[in-house]
Amino acid sequence: MLGVCGCAGNTASSTVGGSTDVSSASSEAKDLEEVSVVLDWYPNGSHVFLYDAIEEGYYEEEGLKIKVEFPSNTNDAISMTSAGKADIGFYYMHDVIQANANQNIPVVSIGAAVQNPVNVLMSLGDKNIKTVADLKGKKIGYGGSVLNEAFVKTMLKNAGLKEDDAELIDVGFELMSSMTTGQVDATIGGFISHEVPELENQGFTVNYIKPTENGVPDYTELVFVTSKENAEKNADKLTRFLRATKKGYEHVKANPEKGVENLLKNQNTENFPLNKDVETKSVATILSLAEKDGAPFLSQSEETWTNNIKWMLDTGVITK
């Protein structure tokens, strides 16, 4: 059965764009139903279950042909699905809430791709920032989103600090370079599954602090979204998509090296080339976060959504 949740959003422009028809040659002879999936970014470890299911033929087994699209703007996973220009988007729980509450955009989540948070406050080892208290007097870089501002403010308050005890600096997409060049002491918005292993691969020691261990309510990071209309009209197709995706998850869990191999086959080498060592660590991290006790892969908790809606209201991220 299709589980739907929906009440969410950095709308900064990026240079991402394009699409990839990733169906195999054997699918040409079959009568397959196309499903367009808009990613949050170029292919990376977060998408391993999707690409594994494609390469292993699980979608074809469900009568589906997957067309992966890369976003031209960072919120395309929501804007394109809500407008009926794509079937499914790969995006973030908080952005779904924001889209519904602040912009009245009719999108819903149909499944949790990564149950646990991956967004962390990170710093290089030589800064010796290991607790929120260590942020006093420090500069924290972020991508300009209201959500990450709320994360930092909540963490500071939870540690007994004032908002102005640390300085927030908008560094755009330069989360890693802003730290390595010394522009800031720490950043919020980077992923434990991407920026952390990437920096470690460059030879840096990385410390990170989890927002959900410092005042921010537990939340689901990555979800599959669609329009409310599509969820109602095409429940069977969406259910088949999720069923095949779960097969991909189970296969990667049993064969992580093969999962990495299938991901690397689908990398966008021109715009976002992947490093095997980094993605191996990334996939291992994603596997450890994709589900948790009482919350198997793809399942959704109404309590988790409700708690985060309340927190977003309390912090002013949403207004209704």
What does each model-identified segment do?
Residues 3-6:
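C-terminal motif of bacterial Sec signal peptides marking the signal peptidase cleavage site
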Residues 8-11:
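Bacterial signal peptide processing site
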Residues 15-170, 181, 185-193, 209:
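Short, glycine-/small- and polar/acidic-enriched structural segments
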Residues 46, 55, 74-77, 92-95, ...:
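Stable alpha-helical elements in mature extracytoplasmic
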Residues 58, 64, 161, 204, ...:
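Helix N-cap/coil-helix junction residues
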Residues 67, 75, 213, 277-284:
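Short linear loop/turn motifs
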Residues 94, 174-177, 183-269:
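Pocket-lining segment of extracytoplasmic ligand-binding domains
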Residues 233-317:
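Secondary-structure end/capping motifs
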